[in-house]
């Protein structure tokens, strides 16, 4: 059998297959339909956002527009006054630990290099919750830990930094 006759598994193909498998597992671990339906009927979810810059701020505004309760957070929450005003009466701001406690769902929107510290600092508040990690490792910004995350797989690395959460990547 020649090399051209063999099925060649590319990195991209492998990662796509792994991604589909991971998505299937993530969906299987989502709350029961009754829980989601109850939250939907109530009209809103309580969402805590750790990191309210460009990404966290923009997503939070959209969620607020959809009627959800939003807790924006930053190490400098006094700088979020304008963002909270834009988001409306169901929005508030404070420190990251308060956002982690507040949210039924938590969005982490910080540089990937900060993820290990977020996990160490707020793991108890986020335990068992759906946590959305929207960061991506970049070696130029995040240093050697980015190389490690890329090599192991970002989802695997993130799960290690955020123990006990229901991780969405």
Model-based region annotation:
Residues 2-22:
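N-terminal secretory signal peptides and thylakoid transit peptides that target proteins
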Residues 30-66, 71, 75-80, 90:
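C-terminal segment of N-terminal export signals and the immediately downstream linker at the start
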Residues 60-62, 84-85, 118-123, 143-145:
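Short amphipathic alpha-helical segments
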Residues 81, 120, 156-159:
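Active-site phosphate/pyrophosphate- and oxyanion-stabilizing loops and adjacent acidic/basic residues
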Residues 96-126, 130, 137-139:
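Rossmann-like NAD(P)-binding element
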Residues 135-168:
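Rossmann-fold NAD(P)-binding glycine/threonine-rich loop
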């Amino acid at each position: 059998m020649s090399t051209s006759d063999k099925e060649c598994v590319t990195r991209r193909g492998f990662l796509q297959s792994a991604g589909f498998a991971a998505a299937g597992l993530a969906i299987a671990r989502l709350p029961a339909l009754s829980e989601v339906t109850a939250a939907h009927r109530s009209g809103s979810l309580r969402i805590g956002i750790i990191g309210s810059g460009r990404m966290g701020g923009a997503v939070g505004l959209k969620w607020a527009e959809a009627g959800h309760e939003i807790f924006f957070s930053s190490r400098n929450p006094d700088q979020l006054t304008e963002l909270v005003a834009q988001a409306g009466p169901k929005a508030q701001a404070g420190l990251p630990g308060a956002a982690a406690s507040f949210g039924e769902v938590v969005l982490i929107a910080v540089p990937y290099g900060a993820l290990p510290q977020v996990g160490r600092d707020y793991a108890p508040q986020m335990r068992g919750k759906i946590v959305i990690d929207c960061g991506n490792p970049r070696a130029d910004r995040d240093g050697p830990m980015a190389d490690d995350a890329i090599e192991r797989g970002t989802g695997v690395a993130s799960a290690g930094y955020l123990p006990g959460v229901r991780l969405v990547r």
